[in-house]
């Protein structure tokens, strides 16, 4: 935790370590958003309509043609960055479990109300997740028209395809030039190596792998209105947009890849708090009114801290003593296991309570 510009608390458990480069999963979406904000500032002439720029065109996404649904013509960059494109991505079922996956559903949100959407399963999950990384995102099914509902999915990867075409380089290289080098990050990368092969492109929907202190540096950059030392690395106008509700998403408290607490749905946290969760319980939080940045590490499975996923060298000896730990089951006095997102919000409330007690 960083408070008033100082590292005031740091504690690691199990495989977590200061030098670890875990797959932070959807925390990576925050960085995709930041990169898009920088892109729009540096290439303003390419985005005369700003976030309202329609991007399913030959200029930005020629790979998307022919469009799988004519409604895609109306998708704006702001829709991609708030998960309101209307695209429903395929579910990648494990071999032999396709029937189970098909029977499940995803939960969309329309003006605060849940909408259950039946899963659809990719017929070739290995190909879609690896070789056709871009195409499988671009050719999802439309469950509603752009802007008409929120659904957590692969929209930010599509935004990263737009970025790749506009700036002429991969998302990881762009982040390295615009943030990592100026801020002095240590070893970092993306979890691009999968069981089915290596991804051809930086995954815009997640997978960034930073040291814990560099994750905090990024949060501190946001808390300091996009400034690092004497440089404005992130456009202030974009930072102001991502930290409050977005007109592109009237359905849920999710702005430009950040959960925002303006509505007070995290009751124990200030309403100016904004943050992002990652699978398994990762969380990176900014609370401007308390001048506080928090990073919560976690683990989804054995692959989370596996250096084979990132290709980065292991520079420490992992502590495996907690590998078999499991939470206490539910009873009258114990809540039992909770989901990653619930845990992320609860952790925010507990840290805030400790800071203001």
Predicted segment positions?
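Active-site-proximal alpha-helical segments within enzyme catalytic domains
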Residues: 155-162, 206-228, 282-299
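Structured C-terminal helix/loop/strand segments within mature extracytoplasmic catalytic/sensor domains
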Residues: 276-357
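Active-site rim elements
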Residues: 67-68, 145-149, 202-207, 271-280, ...
């Amino acid at each position: 935790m960083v408070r008033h510009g100082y590292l005031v608390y740091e504690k690691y458990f199990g495989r977590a370590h200061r030098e670890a480069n875990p797959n932070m999963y959807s925390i990576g979406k925050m960085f995709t958003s930041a990169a898009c904000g920088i892109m729009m500032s540096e290439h303003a002439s390419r985005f005369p309509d700003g976030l309202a720029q329609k991007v399913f065109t030959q200029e930005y996404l020629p790979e998307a043609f022919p469009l799988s649904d004519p409604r895609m013509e109306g998708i704006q960059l702001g829709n991609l960055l708030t998960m309101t494109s209307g695209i429903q991505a395929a579910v990648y079922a494990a071999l032999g479990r396709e029937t189970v996956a098909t029977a499940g559903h995803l939960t969309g949100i329309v003006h605060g109300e849940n909408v259950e959407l039946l899963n659809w399963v990719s017929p070739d999950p290995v190909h879609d997740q690896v070789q056709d990384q871009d195409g499988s995102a671009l050719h999802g099914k439309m469950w509603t028209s752009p802007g008409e509902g929120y659904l957590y999915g692969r929209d930010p990867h599509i935004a990263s395809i737009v970025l790749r075409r506009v700036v002429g380089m991969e998302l990881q290289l762009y982040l390295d030039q615009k943030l990592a080098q100026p801020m002095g990050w240590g070893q970092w990368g993306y979890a691009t190596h999968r069981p089915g092969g290596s991804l051809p492109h930086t995954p815009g929907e997640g997978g960034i792998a930073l040291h814990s202190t560099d994750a905090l540096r990024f949060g501190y950059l946001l808390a300091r209105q996009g400034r690092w030392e004497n440089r404005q690395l992130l456009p202030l106008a974009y930072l102001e947009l991502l930290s409050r509700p977005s007109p592109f998403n009237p359905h849920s408290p999710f702005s430009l890849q950040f959960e925002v607490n303006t509505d007070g749905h995290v009751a124990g946290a200030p309403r100016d708090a904004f943050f992002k969760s990652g699978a398994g319980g990762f969380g990176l939080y900014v609370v401007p009114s308390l001048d506080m940045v928090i990073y919560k590490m976690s683990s989804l499975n054995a692959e989370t801290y596996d250096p084979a996923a990132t290709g980065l060298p292991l520079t420490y000896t992992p502590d495996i003593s907690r590998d078999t730990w499991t939470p206490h089951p539910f009873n009258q006095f114990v809540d039992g296991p909770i989901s990653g997102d619930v845990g992320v919000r609860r952790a925010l409330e507990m840290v805030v309570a400790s800071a203001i007690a």
